[in-house]
């Protein structure tokens, strides 16, 4: 999860360089941010149940492959359009990685302590979101051709993580359905609310998460 999230946030300090290199307007930068969020939102809504169907490990592997491919495409981007495509891919991969890794941490937690699994998930995400801009900023300042070389650490770490995950073999969870073709209703999102007694803390927590990511996006856009 940490490596995948790092790849999603790595480009934030590079946007001023892209703006100077391609002569971008502020609206172009906004569009690039929206492209990533569109991919992430679509992934969370329509691909969030893949882990229930196939298990978290295959979904996590494919998510890491996709985010590494998106980061590599970012390094090779030759126009705004190609960079937007890379950000959409990274957004889709971000949703796959965060959902599957969160489920995996919960399932592999031997103590069955949900709070501990949640803390580990939050720590991994925060570390990845912090390392991404840090590595991107340092590479942009000190390494030649930063619009290409800044992505190298993420590509290398992504490759290592993919290799490591393919060495891990876990039994198929009993809750996973038998392999087969997805019907249309399997792809459609199911948005539900918890029982009435838990709705207020649920909505407060959701508002807190929304505000946190909104503030992060605001400051990242001003970097």
Protein language model annotation of sequence segments:
Residues 169-192:
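Flexible cytoplasmic inter-helical loops of multi-pass small-molecule transporters
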Residues 31-49, 98-103:
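Central cavity-lining transmembrane alpha-helices of secondary-active solute carriers
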Residues 86-127:
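Cytoplasmic helix-loop-helix junction between adjacent transmembrane helices
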Residues 112, 116-169:
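Helix-loop-helix hairpin linking two adjacent transmembrane segments in secondary transporters
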Residues 23, 55, 76-82, 144:
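Helix-breaking motifs and short loop linkers at transmembrane-helix boundaries and internal kinks
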Residues 1-26, 217-223:
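Extracytoplasmic
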Residues 70-73, 81-90:
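Paired small-residue
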Residues 201-223:
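Extracytoplasmic gate region of multi-pass secondary transporters
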């Amino acid at each position: 999860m940490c490596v995948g999230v790092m790849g999603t946030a790595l480009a934030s300090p590079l946007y001023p360089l892209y703006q100077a290199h391609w002569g971008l307007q502020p609206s172009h930068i906004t569009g690039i941010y929206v492209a990533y969020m569109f991919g992430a939102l679509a992934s969370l809504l329509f691909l969030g149940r893949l882990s229930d169907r196939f298990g978290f490990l295959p979904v996590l592997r494919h998510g890491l492959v996709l985010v590494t491919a998106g980061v590599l495409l970012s390094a090779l981007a030759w126009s705004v359009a190609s960079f937007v495509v890379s950000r959409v891919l990274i957004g889709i991969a971000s949703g796959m990685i965060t959902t599957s890794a969160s489920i995996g941490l919960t399932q592999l937690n031997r103590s069955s302590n949900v709070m501990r699994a949640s803390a580990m998930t939050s720590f991994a995400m925060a570390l990845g979101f912090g390392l991404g801009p840090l590595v991107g900023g340092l590479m942009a300042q000190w390494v030649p051709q930063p619009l290409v070389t800044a992505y190298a650490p993420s590509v290398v770490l992504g490759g290592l993580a993919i290799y490591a995950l393919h060495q891990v073999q876990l039994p198929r969870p009993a809750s996973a359905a038998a392999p087969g073709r997805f019907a249309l209703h399997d792809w459609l999102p199911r948005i539900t609310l918890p029982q009435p007694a838990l709705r207020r803390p649920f909505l407060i927590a959701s508002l807190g998460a929304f505000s946190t990511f909104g503030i992060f996006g605001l400051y990242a856009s001003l970097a």
